[in-house]
């Protein structure tokens, strides 16, 4: 294990209208032709930047509501916590979490204490969706570029009273069901998805929480189309469940993002509670081919720097296409003020990988 080696920094330049949200980036994915796709945990849109003279610019925003039907008005955030690309689809996942109101400096102690009693959830947070992505543009529906007999269609996991089919399936899970039914907020070690990666037909989602006696949890699912625009879960578990659970020892940390590297899984790990760090990068060899009911101990690869109430690493994506050597691009929530450039820019880091 080593400290991170900073190879480079790149400027991400957004339009002025996105100025405030450059400080709450929560998901990132670099696709071919050097498009950078990003999500914020405070919006219901997907952002695209283009590689331009060793930085990312030419910001274009895609409203998710233009591609799939949201269960609530788009003014209510999806809380996008993961983005990935596979098979001409861009995948996004919301946090699937409850949230607790936080104290505000302009309110009295008594009012802030009362705020800490209030927990809520929002229907848009339970979005797991895939949107066709062809030639750098999102589409609601289009013909598969390599097979004219296949139609690509924007779809989401079926919505239910419990949020969606995944939450319905997890409600009786012996490890996670209590957290789901008790409606424990994500930052209180409650159920909270942060990170998605897709390998062939398998979808992996990392849980920031709950962390169970020091063990983090990763979910694996497979989906199928049941009707236009709707996805359902397949039965994939040996026990007949619609999901698999994989337990990871990450030194007591939760999962903050996932990334496929060949057939290995890179895991960005950080605190499940409202803490600055530690933040660490792990590698799980052969992580896309995991058996159930096995405890895994991924290899600690390197530490990721973090700040004092700032610079919280939230998203990772492979970046070797940018500078020609194995590397990882990292974006931060609550970036340090030194990272903010003009009215729309924020600096991301490129770390050496391997």
Predicted feature descriptions by range:
Residues 1-354:
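Sequence/structural signature of beta-propeller domains
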């Amino acid at each position: 294990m080593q400290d991170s080696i900073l190879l480079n920094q790149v400027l991400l330049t957004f339009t002025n209208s996105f100025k405030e949200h450059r400080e709450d980036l929560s998901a990132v994915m670099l696709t071919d032709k050097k498009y950078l796709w990003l999500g914020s945990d405070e919006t219901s849109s997907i952002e695209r930047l283009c590689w331009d003279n060793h930085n990312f610019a030419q910001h274009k925003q895609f409203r998710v509501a233009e591609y799939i039907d949201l269960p609530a008005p788009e003014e209510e955030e999806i809380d996008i916590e993961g983005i990935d690309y596979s098979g001409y689809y861009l995948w996004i996942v919301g946090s699937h979490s409850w949230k607790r109101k936080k104290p505000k400096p302009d309110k009295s102690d008594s009012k802030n204490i009362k705020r800490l009693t209030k927990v809520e959830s929002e229907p848009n947070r339970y979005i797991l969706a895939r949107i066709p992505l062809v030639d750098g543009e999102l589409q609601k529906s289009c013909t598969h570029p390599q097979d004219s007999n296949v139609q690509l269609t924007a779809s989401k996991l079926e919505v239910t009273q419990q949020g969606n089919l995944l939450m319905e399936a997890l409600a009786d899970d012996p490890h996670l069901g209590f957290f789901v039914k008790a409606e424990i907020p994500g930052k209180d070690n409650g159920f909270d998805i942060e990170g998605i990666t897709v390998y062939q037909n398998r979808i992996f989602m990392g849980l920031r929480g709950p962390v169970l006696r020091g063990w983090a949890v990763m979910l694996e699912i497979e989906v199928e189309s049941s009707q236009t625009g709707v996805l359902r879960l397949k039965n994939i578990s040996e026990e007949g469940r619609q999901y698999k659970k994989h337990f990871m020892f990450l030194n007591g940390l939760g999962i903050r993002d996932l990334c496929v590297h060949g057939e290995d899984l890179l895991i960005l790990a950080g605190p499940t509670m409202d803490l600055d760090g530690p933040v660490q990068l792990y590698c799980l060899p052969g992580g896309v081919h995991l058996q159930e009911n096995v405890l895994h101990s991924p290899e600690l690869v390197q530490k990721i720097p973090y700040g004092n109430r700032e610079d919280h690493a939230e998203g990772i994506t492979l970046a070797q296409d940018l500078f020609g050597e194995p590397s990882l691009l990292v974006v931060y929530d609550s970036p340090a003020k030194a990272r903010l450039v003009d009215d729309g820019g924020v600096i991301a880091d490129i770390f050496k990988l391997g």
